Amino acid sequence: MKKAKAIFSLVVALMVLAIFCFAQNTGSTATTAAAAVDSNNDDWLHCKGNKIYDMYGNEVWLTGANWFGFNCSENCFHGAWYDVKTILTSIADRGINLLRIPISTELLYSWMIGKPNPVSSVTASNNPPYHVVNPDFYDPETDDVKNSMEIFDIIMGYCKELGIKVMIDIHSPDANNSGHNYELWYGKETSTCGVVTTKMWIDTLVWLADKYKNDDTIIAFDLKNEPHGKRGYTAEVPKLLAKWDNSTDENNWKYAAETCAKAILEVNPKVLIVIEGVEQYPKTEKGYTYDTPDIWGATGDASPWYSAWWGGNLRGVKDYPIDLGPLNSQIVYSPHDYGPSVYAQPWFEKDFTMQTLLDDYWYDTWAYIHDQGIAPILIGEWGGHMDGGKNQKWMTLLRDYIVQNRIHHTFWCINPNSGDTGGLLGNDWSTWDEAKYALLKPALWQTKDGKFIGLDHKIPLGSKGISLGEYYGTPQASDPPATPTATPTKPAASSTPSFIYGDINSDGNVNSTDLGILKRIIVKNPPASANMDAADVNADGKVNSTDYTVLKRYLLRSIDKLPHTT
């Protein structure tokens, strides 16, 4: 029993520490702080085949959306003139369990050197009862808004509290609202840090990974948004061309991604590394390489090139797969895919179906990676206008393919101010486009009765969702981590059993997750690792509905200790 008390004391200490770290300076309550308690290191993910698993071997489905702004000149979410936490709460309640956050290398560099660039177009006021908007962004010492890094850290705390996980996307080298148009991850002049180099790009990502290595809110890094560029017709290979081959050239995206990924995984081997494709890939089966100029007017079989959306071409994986050695378990490939309202690609010219899209574009460009079990696919951007025509038809077909194959994805986008696609939110940043959301909703991870499933083992996804722990009942060890990470420490077996009454999943806490497991025990569907001794919370030698009532009363604080024997 001493051992159980020691475990319980450690858990209490960790809870207090978590509350201290994530409680906000203003507007915080004990309830809010308690909701943010998390062990910080139990939600890391890894891959096996084309699936993604939690550290206990339970399969997960990453179903999210994009919210841009940190990549832009404002250095903060667009829409921060409204209350960001309110928007995030709505996002969580709508079932988005992963938020892809575009950001610039320029902004990360300012954080890394300790001189965070300022934000603009952010409202921050804490003057109750008259005006309270983003009160945690307000700095009373300066009577002004906090800097970009402080605001980002606060937002990560909000995401943790709401059960939202985050994927960082290096959207552009410079802080630029049109920065995605630049082809590469290096070579761009910025207004605050000179020219972004490959080293700067890697160093800033490693710095951020190290900063958050003990906080599993950020679970993935999308190394570079949409590397692209066309080969052209000249003999000389263009400098602004992202290619995918076996060279060590600086513009070889495959080589750069491997180099960057290995550096990140040195500081945190548990994060997912998300790698996009390029725009063009040579027809290597015909002997063509990146040294082969394009042919004027050549199309179809006559062209030396396979074309795709920016960042969408992953044909190179079949010839030159990413190799991270023992940490290949962290690789996720990530195409982007759009409809005809963004650009009238040739595969949209016919009366297309899911099968024609697969035959003409999807399968050989990226879907084969999932189909052949090479690695998971996460479609980092997809979305568009609800036009009632071809674009909406494409969006529905891709949605159906995502659902049928449980493809991971992040929808583009939350923002209403994306010109190519529009957003899930209206211009007031509070009204949802219900028709577009209805199209997306079936592709969000949820139970059969419509409860959204988060990626945090303890914190439910918003007010209408459940946690991963509640969904699976208790961690399962059927597929142990493939990454070199420490396994969870649990009480060792001894001749005298040590346990905490009510701690049915043996994680050191007594909470609603245990109540859910107890319910499964009562209906004869117990998890294999459930601690039946801990479930007998009235110590009568049986586990039945009486124990459920007792544990529920304990969690509601109607009784103050377990076992409850009266």
Curated annotation (Swiss-Prot):
Gene3D superfamilies named in the record: Dockerin domain, Glycosidases
One Gene Ontology biological process: cellulose catabolic process
Record's keyword terms, sorted: Carbohydrate metabolism, Cellulose degradation, Glycosidase, Hydrolase, Polysaccharide degradation, Signal
Residues in Dockerin domain copies: 497-564
GO molecular function per UniProt: cellulase activity
Region ranges (Disordered): 473-494
Top EC class, one word: hydrolase
Gene Ontology terms: cellular component: cellulosome
Top-level taxon in the UniProt lineage: Bacteria
EC number: 3.2.1.4
Active site residues of this protein: 226, 381
Low complexity composition bias: residue spans: 474-494
Reaction(s) the record says it catalyses: Endohydrolysis of (1->4)-beta-D-glucosidic linkages in cellulose, lichenin and cereal beta-D-glucans
Stretch forming the signal peptide: 1-30
Pfam families: Cellulase (PF00150), Dockerin_1 (PF00404)
Described function: This enzyme catalyzes the endohydrolysis of 1,4-beta-glucosidic linkages in cellulose, lichenin and cereal beta-D-glucans.
Similarity remark: Belongs to the glycosyl hydrolase 5 (cellulase A) family.
PANTHER family xref list: ENDOGLUCANASE, MAJOR EXTRACELLULAR ENDOGLUCANASE
Protein's name according to its UniProt entry: Endoglucanase G
Organism the protein comes from: Acetivibrio thermocellus (strain ATCC 27405 / DSM 1237 / JCM 9322 / NBRC 103400 / NCIMB 10682 / NRRL B-4536 / VPI 7372) (Clostridium thermocellum)
